[in-house]
């Protein structure tokens, strides 16, 4: 029976500052390190082991994945990094404080940008200090100007089908350390959630979500580790 564990990264510096982060690369806070380590220890104590791990190309997710593996004394497990597991791109909201943004644009508009399925935030302005066009980790990648959750799903699922699903079908035990919205894309796909259901689905930082899957990768069970 294939096992899949999804873990959102631990608290980041911009989670703490209540800023829209998206593709911008920020580090974990001390609390974030503790969350990731605690999640890894809880997985190890409950007998979870992994054969392969997948993560994004952003520091907060990479470190979380490594801390989970290290807690289980399996830092040697092969880990693949790919930009398609990055967080949703928040476009022109990147770097802005969420409360300040609500004061400027209105809480209702910000709620639509954050929690609608198919409405993206305004695009990032040309010349923004958060422009990533010169970042070599994205060589050959068409960096989005902004993304809705629907757009995020559209880039995550091909990677799932191409790289992750085959490992699970081969019986591998898989860990994915990523972000709230890229993981929502996978939960929507696996659990067949509607557009309305997935925007309400919350993934706490550093809390592993376990899928026990049938051989055809339909879910047999899904639960947060702290629920069992």
UniProtKB/Swiss-Prot annotation:
Disulfide bonds: none
EC number: 5.4.2.11
PROSITE patterns hit by this protein: PG_MUTASE
SUPFAM superfamilies, sorted: Phosphoglycerate mutase-like
Function: Catalyzes the interconversion of 2-phosphoglycerate and 3-phosphoglycerate.
Family affiliation: Belongs to the phosphoglycerate mutase family. BPG-dependent PGAM subfamily.
Name used for this protein in its record: 2,3-bisphosphoglycerate-dependent phosphoglycerate mutase
């Amino acid at each position: 029976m294939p096992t899949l564990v999804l873990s959102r990264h631990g608290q980041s510096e911009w989670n703490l500052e209540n800023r829209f982060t998206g593709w911008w690369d920020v580090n974990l806070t001390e609390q974030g390190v503790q969350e990731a380590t605690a999640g890894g220890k809880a997985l190890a104590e409950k007998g979870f082991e992994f054969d392969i791990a997948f993560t994004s190309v952003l520091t907060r997710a990479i470190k979380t994945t490594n801390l989970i593996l290290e807690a289980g004394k399996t830092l040697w497990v092969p880990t693949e990094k790919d930009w398609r597991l990055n967080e949703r791109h928040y476009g022109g909201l990147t770097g802005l404080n969420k409360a300040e943004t609500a004061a400027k644009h209105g809480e209702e508009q910000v709620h639509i940008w954050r929690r609608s399925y198919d409405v993206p935030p305004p695009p990032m302005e040309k010349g923004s200090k958060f422009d990533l066009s010169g970042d070599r980790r994205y060589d050959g990648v068409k960096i989005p100007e902004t993304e809705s959750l629907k757009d995020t799903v559209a880039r995550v699922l091909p990677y799932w089908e191409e790289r992750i699903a085959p490992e699970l079908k081969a019986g591998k035990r898989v860990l994915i350390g990523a972000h709230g919205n890229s993981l929502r894309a996978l939960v929507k796909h696996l659990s067949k959630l509607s557009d309305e259901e997935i925007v309400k689905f919350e993934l706490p930082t550093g809390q592993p979500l376990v899928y026990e899957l049938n051989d055809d990768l339909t879910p047999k069970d899904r639960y947060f580790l702290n629920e069992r």
